[in-house]
């Protein structure tokens, strides 16, 4: 399986359940947002501001994969990016590059518009030049309700459902793997090979997400709409109800069989 595999966790699988059961009606739009401070992280993780990295490639996979696993492939993307505070000085005492000047090589702020094959329209906002406290948002707006998801970098972030004239309610998890379950994609792949079926964390979906981020950066550079060339088959949801560690409850891993 290909990372990230957090979409197989309790949070995103429950969100997928809500959408596929029609609890928000027909999905119309979606919105993903994350803000961090790589000015702090970058002082001891310098790869974050090098070419091939940045917040887009560091965190974008979690958000785009979560949406892809629910909404399917994209048709096109367009974007704007910027490098906020390009010239920096390392202020972390004890760091190998302490007091050295350095330059950000990649955008640390990006805003993208996305069109899915299904017709759903979405936006992606990523900013790594904000306060240290991380802010995340992942939402799908439907004709009959709104799905509010937690941090897709976690397996068990809370999921909320909002209906007309009502406050958002915490939706109970329908699936297992609520705790940190890194490696879940590889485990699901192993069970899939044993069963002779396609695994869910596929290279096709991962490549599509990879192309999406490249397309976003390319669109920002050339000012043109990026038409997606890759596609993938929407992965089936894991069977619901396998929540627990065995004993008097179902064991989570049985959902992978």
Regions inferred by a protein language model and the residue ranges of each:
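Predominantly a Rossmann-like dinucleotide-binding segment in NAD(P)-dependent oxidoreductases
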Residues: 1, 6-103, 223
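Contiguous beta-strand/loop segments that form the cofactor/metal-binding neighborhood of enzyme cores
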Residues: 26, 65-155, 183-199, 213-216, ...
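Structured beta->alpha junctions
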Residues: 4-7, 34, 128-130, 205, ...
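C-terminal hydrophobic helical "lid"/dimerization subdomain
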Residues: 206-218
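Short, hydrophobic secondary-structure boundary micro-motifs
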Residues: 2-3, 27, 42, 171, ...
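Ligand-binding pocket scaffold of soluble enzyme catalytic domains
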Residues: 12, 181-184
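Glycine- and charged-residue-rich phosphate/anionic-cofactor binding loop of Rossmann-like
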Residues: 3, 168-174, 192-209
């Amino acid at each position: 399986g290909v990372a990230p595999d957090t979409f197989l966790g309790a949070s995103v699988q429950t969100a997928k359940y809500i959408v596929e059961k029609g609890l928000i009606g027909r999905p119309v739009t979606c919105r993903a947002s994350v803000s961090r401070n790589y000015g702090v992280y970058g002082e001891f993780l310098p790869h974050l501001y090098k070419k091939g990295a940045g917040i887009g490639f560091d965190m974008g996979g979690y958000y785009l994969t979560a949406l892809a696993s629910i909404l399917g492939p994209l048709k096109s993307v367009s974007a704007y990016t910027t490098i906020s505070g390009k010239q920096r000085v390392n202020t972390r005492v004890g760091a190998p590059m302490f007091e050295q000047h350095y330059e950000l090589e990649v955008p640390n702020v990006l805003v993208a518009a996305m069109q899915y094959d299904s017709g759903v329209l979405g936006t992606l906002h990523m900013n790594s030049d904000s306060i240290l406290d991380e802010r995340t948002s992942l939402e799908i707006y439907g004709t009959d309700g709104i799905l509010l998801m937690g941090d897709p970098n976690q397996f068990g972030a809370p999921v909320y459902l909002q209906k007309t004239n009502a406050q958002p309610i915490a939706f109970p998890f329908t699936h297992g793997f609520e705790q940190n379950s890194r490696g879940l994609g590889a485990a699901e792949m192993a069970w899939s090979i044993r069963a002779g079926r396609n695994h869910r964390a596929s290279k096709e979906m991962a490549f599509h997400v990879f192309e999406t981020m490249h397309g976003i950066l390319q669109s920002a550079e050339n000012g043109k709409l990026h038409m997606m060339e890759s596609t993938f088959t929407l992965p089936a949801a894991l069977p619901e109800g396998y929540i627990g560690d065995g004993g008097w409850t179902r064991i989570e891993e049985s959902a992978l069989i």
